[in-house]
């Protein structure tokens, strides 16, 4: 499995400038109140209509250097070439398109019946073909690492270690369990499950905590989104330092750009970062975003130009709502948001089960 990560990193480094340019940040103006009118002001324009399922099966990234995108805009399919030029796709018949009916280079999209990492769709023009290089909509197509030694052994070793000290002073920790604030918060804690990049649980409990000011800000975000028909689905929040150490030790050298350095700690370790998405209040189901949670591909960029209009709209709505209450997005991960006061808190290393027992968390710090 490590080879998949290595291959993917090479693709990221070779990402064309047109995609990188399209992913530059575009910041939203904060909103202040949770009234219906204020909630409406968070909307990133009119809500687009969804697209046919067959379109979603082919919309994505193609080419080993991520040189081609198929995307949807205004209920039309577009082909974006390696120079960043968008061309509208005109259907000829099943799986066949052209960009110019008068002088048609035929674009063929092959969609296998069984989609797997070794059997992916490909796009062909003349004698050139580009395989699809993102995991589509299936979390089973993630890139994984196979740590040696296994996660259980890495956890045993990490729990014996002490986080690095930092100059203080810091605020006293006040970790708050998010779901206790409102039933509108739902949990899907991936690192307490097997469907994560390690293919193994790292947490012993599926719980989510944040420092109280951050948790209360997140509650205000939820109250702004609820009138619009959305709730918040939490994937991760406070992360004990030993888990960051596990991630670091489990990841091969070429993959460490995707994980936090335990010698520096992370915003998750401070209880001031949260990984989350939207869910539909009517169905209870997560909404579709341009990419999947924890996906190691350009679809994770906060301003990735691909996907469908509705997927981008949902992603931008989440960002606008979070930024309105003092959170900032990680530009490489549309789901990751940091609270504005994170520098005021030190690194914590209290496991979830000890928080439940009332163990007071302490930052590992010293005064200068």
Residue spans of the language-model regions?
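Bacterial N-terminal signal peptides that target proteins for export
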Residues: 2-13
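A mature extracytoplasmic/lumenal domain signature
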Residues: 83, 93, 103, 191-193, ...
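Bacterial N-terminal signal peptides
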Residues: 12-25
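Peripheral terminal and inter-domain segments
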Residues: 28-152
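Beta-rich nucleic-acid/ligand-interaction surfaces
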Residues: 241-247, 337-344
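K/E-rich alpha-helical interaction surfaces of small helical-bundle regulatory domains
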Residues: 57-68, 322-326, 333, 338
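Extracytoplasmic cell-surface/polysaccharide-interacting catalytic and binding patches
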Residues: 140-235, 250-332, 341-368
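Intrinsic disorder/low-complexity segments
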Residues: 6-7, 32-35, 362-367
